[in-house]
A protein has these predicted regions:
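Terminal presequence/propeptide segments associated with secretion/organelle targeting
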Residues: 2-5, 9-10, 14, 18-714
Length: 714
């Protein structure tokens, strides 16, 4: 499920992520100011490369390219309409689909709300839910959607404010001007405002959003049909998932009446039909340098995958001692398996010699263009080498960076926080680490003082696994190894640390927080003693890493400026979890020596369940067994397209040229995962729930005629 990756921030997102939300109100245009070079399209750009994909921004749509490829170039009214009909959840995409504020997204995007509104004696995630009337719709605590109102270029203003001579100075100045622009925007408009860095700093845009904070759950199917096939089918196709949920936006305690919403297509999209996906892709690395990709291939991703394997092994060890642990860790296991598949796919793309040759050829050509111009060479020519040197140095101390920390144990993490709170609280606010300034410090203290359950066997296995891995990668003389193991085996050290600590006791943690630096310094709790030793090691490697990453950020911004100066908007920028429109077609593909069809049907759902004897994860909710005869089994269920998506696109609408909703994006196939770095459309596919399948299920399985009629405008 693609959104789960977008929530995991081990992947660098190129957007400036500070967002300011306002509450005042004044009229604001819903227009989009065209980006510089917006008229430049792939057909006229120098050396356009299709491996950069089709995640187009709304201020630079490639109209000439669309006209030539699909015989269709939408006007500004069409673009404004579909932009305003699309809304962003905190971790997903979604869209207005009725004049009464219905919002369509994925089941897994609404999971938090579904869990929160479930009654004590039931769980809507397992049972499903369909509101019989407006009064039955359940308010989702803390959930909101953002509607993109306008886009304004602010590149010149941002660059004018960055005058520093060192990467650290430039980073501070960049953060300051971004914060100022966002605050001014909030104060003058009352909207939620975000300055977005595109082309790695080659271009900056101010995105203004209207936020709707009263959302209510209208309908959600059972998780078993929403994610039918579980991990074995995740990132695969053919699929048979009803991964959908319906929310409703309210305004002043009444259903919202949006001016722009997507009308429903009863027939959906057919084979070969052009479709557009509108959503908020989270993060891609197509503009990364070759050195950055090689670091991820050789260092970053292998370490990440090893960490996932350790975490899964720890859970399995815990389950072997406690049979009830399987249910407790079910979601965590699925998340780890999901992430493992994704990162394995990312790395597969970087191991692929043909893809890397493509990247090398583009970078060589790009650098040659820069070096051919004396002015560009003087400004940007050394940036690639600076990035490569910084990446090399990061690789040299990567093991220390990963192990000189306080995770993944909850007990050790709390000990580390306690030690750090004591140290930082004694400093003036401006001198503290950024994460401990202002109200953040009080929030950390409050979190430490709250009761929380501790799984002791899990903690022992977790610490032992981390120490064992550190022992394998760090030399015996390493200061972390000396203080953490102290001559013991990883298992013996973990046993002593967990058995001897009182960090699981909220009252004990509270006494240390209230006692401050003196209490922490005097404590002989084994985890506090260890955390006191780790803290200076961690500060050193983090400071070194921050310094190198500042060099990388400064130079990748220069590369982004160089890229933009040559290619303009003819190449789409990397994903930034902001609204994009991607073009593609409905199309099957060759797989496993045969051909995958462009669509699946309900016939296939029951065939796949039957082939696995209806055993988990191929079992069906009871209503899907007893009500099978109600369905028209030939109805399309899921389908695939060549659109360009990644994590964050979950819940995106797929629309036709009439701006009608034909599908709901929920995943990509396994071949799609390497598209994170270089896009291809030969076998990678986007997977969507078919609009006809959604209506068929709502009417026949969930007695949801009220809801279906609203969707279909009846």
């Amino acid at each position: 499920m693609i959104s789960r990756i977008s929530c995991m921030r081990f992947i660098v997102v190129s957007a400036v992520t500070l967002v300011v939300a306002g509450c005042a109100s004044s009229p604001v245009s819903t227009s989009v100011t065209p980006a510089a070079s917006a008229s430049t399209g792939p057909l006229s750009a120098p050396g356009y490369r299709p491996e950069f994909g089709t995640m187009w921004t709304f201020d630079a749509p490639p109209l000439a390219y669309w006209q030539k490829t699909y015989g269709f170039a939408p006007d500004q009214k069409w673009l404004d309409h579909v932009r305003l009909a699309s809304v962003r959840l905190p971790n997903c995409s979604s869209s207005f689909v009725s004049p009464n504020g219905l919002i369509l997204t994925n089941h897994h995007c609404a999971r938090g709300c579904t869990d929160a509104v479930s009654p004590r004696d039931s769980n809507y995630i397992e049972t499903g839910f369909a509101a019989g009337n407006l009064a039955d719709e359940k308010k989702c605590p803390g959930l909101y959607v953002d509607q993109l109102i306008s886009i304004e270029p602010v590149t010149d203003r941002v660059r004018a404010a960055i005058t520093g001579t060192t990467p650290a100075e430039q980073a501070a100045q960049r953060a300051a001007i971004v914060g100022r622009i966002q605050t001014e925007c909030m104060q003058s408009t009352g909207l939620t405002c975000q300055v977005v860095s595109l082309y790695q700093g080659g271009m900056y845009s101010l995105y203004r959003y209207k936020r709707y904070s009263d959302l209510r759950l209208v309908m959600v199917p059972e998780e078993q049909i929403a994610s039918f096939g579980g991990d074995p089918d995740n990132f695969t196709y053919p699929r048979y998932d009803l991964d959908m949920a319906l929310l409703r936006a309210y305004d002043n305690n009444a259903p919202l009446h949006p001016t722009d919403y997507l009308r429903w297509s009863a027939s959906g999209a057919g084979d070969g039909e052009a479709v557009f996906v509108i959503g908020n892709p989270g993060s891609t690395g197509r503009l990364n340098t070759l050195a950055q990709m090689e670091f991820l291939r050789d260092i970053g991703y292998p370490a990440t995958l090893a960490g996932y394997n350790r975490a899964l092994a720890v859970i399995r060890q815990t389950e072997a001692q406690d049979t009830s642990a399987a249910r407790r860790y079910q979601n965590q296991v699925f998340g780890l398996q999901n992430s493992f598949k994704a990162v394995t796919g990312y790395r597969a793309g970087l191991i692929d010699s043909s893809r890397m040759a493509q990247k090398r050829a583009f970078e060589n050509d790009f650098r040659a263009r820069i070096n051919a111009d004396p002015a560009l060479r003087a400004r940007y020519g050394s940036s690639w080498d600076a990035v490569a040197a910084a990446q090399h140095e990061l690789a040299m101390f990567n093991p220390q960076f990963r192990y000189y920390g306080f995770g993944p144990s909850a007990l050790l993490a709390m000990a580390g926080q306690t030690v750090r709170v004591a140290t930082e609280a004694a400093k003036p606010d401006a001198a503290r680490l950024a994460a401990y300034r202002g109200p953040a410090l009080d929030a950390i203290k409050a979190a430490l003082e709250r009761d929380r359950p501790i799984d002791v066997p899990y903690e022992k296995f977790s610490i032992a696994a981390q120490l064992r891995a550190a022992q394998q990668e760090l030399p015996p003389t390493d200061p972390f190894i000396r203080v953490a193991l102290a001559g013991r085996t990883p298992e013996a050290a973990a046993e002593a640390l967990v058995s001897g600590t009182r960090m699981g006791d909220a009252a004990f943690r509270r006494s240390l927080v209230e006692g401050g630096a003196a209490a922490v310094a005097a404590s002989n709790d084994p985890l506090i003693v260890l955390a006191r030793s780790i803290d200076p090691l961690n500060r050193t490697v983090v400071a070194r890493s921050d310094s190198l990453n500042a060099i990388i950020a400064t130079n990748t911004e220069k590369i982004g400026q160089a890229l933009f100066s040559i290619y303009g908007t003819s190449l789409p920028p990397d994903a930034t979890f902001t609204l994009r429109i991607s073009d593609g077609v409905v199309k099957g593909y060759p797989m496993n020596g045969t051909v995958a069809p462009y669509k699946t049907t309900f016939y296939g759902l029951y065939e796949r369940a039957s082939a696995f004897d209806f055993k988990d994860p191929f079992n069906l909710p009871q209503r899907w067994v007893t009500r099978k005869d109600r369905l028209n089994l030939s109805t399309p269920f899921d389908f695939v397209t060549t659109n360009d998506i990644i994590g964050g696109n979950s819940g995106s609408p797929a629309i036709n040229r009439n701006a009608e909703l034909v599908g709901l994006i929920f995943d990509g196939n396994i071949e799609n995962i390497p598209n994170r770095f270089l896009f291809t459309a030969d076998t990678p596919r986007t997977i969507a729930v078919h609009s006809a399948g959604i209506i068929e299920a709502i009417r026949k399985m969930y007695d949801g005629s009220r809801i279906a009629d609203e969707l279909q405008g009846r």
